[in-house]
Amino acid sequence: RRLRPEAIVEAKKELGFAYEWVATPVSKAKKDLLDRFPELTDAVGAETRDGLTLVRFGLFNLTKEIVTKNQFKHPIKIRFPADTMILSARFGEALKMERKSTAEPVVNESLVLIPAESMNPRSTLIYNLILRGNAVPDSVIGEIEGKGHIDRVH
């Protein structure tokens, strides 16, 4: 008796809620990236831009369902090393959805709190961070009711 192919295919893990970030030193940023950070002049002013890093932090609803803001157990917490100075944290853009909230991230020393927002299936919210110092987060913590902990996209 032969096994049917579908009998040996493992069930795929359902995609969930995830994040990813990309850090680019200002000195290496191309015009199209700089254009996505109109707040750069306000955040830095006449100060030197040496050592500044632009971070695009994306939240992804990879499920086939709407995730409501009430499903967030708490705001997404992005913790940077203590010596990292967070000069700005702002909403950047929404993909595959219309953003209904005007809430902005909150900065508390080396911590950025991303506010809970409803997200459409397969949608993305991108936040712009301007940092001086180490741009690699120590941790990213978040949990969505019914979806579990937020994971980094690999």
Language-model regions, residue ranges each:
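Short, well-ordered beta-strand segments enriched in hydrophobic/aromatic residues
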Residues: T53-N61, R122
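Hydrophobic, helix-forming membrane-interacting segments
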Residues: R1-V22
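Extracellular adhesion/glycan-binding regions together with long Ser/Thr-
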Residues: R99-S123
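Solvent-exposed beta-hairpin/edge-strand motifs
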Residues: F72-K96
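Short, solvent-exposed beta-strand/turn "edge" segments of beta-rich domains on protein surfaces
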Residues: A29-L54, E65-N70, S118
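Proline/serine/threonine-rich low-complexity linkers at boundaries of modular beta-sandwich domains
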Residues: K12, A23-L33
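Extended, hydrophilic extramembrane loops/domains of integral membrane proteins
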Residues: E117-H154
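Asparagine-centered strand-capping/turn motif at beta-strand->loop junctions
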Residues: L59-F72, F80
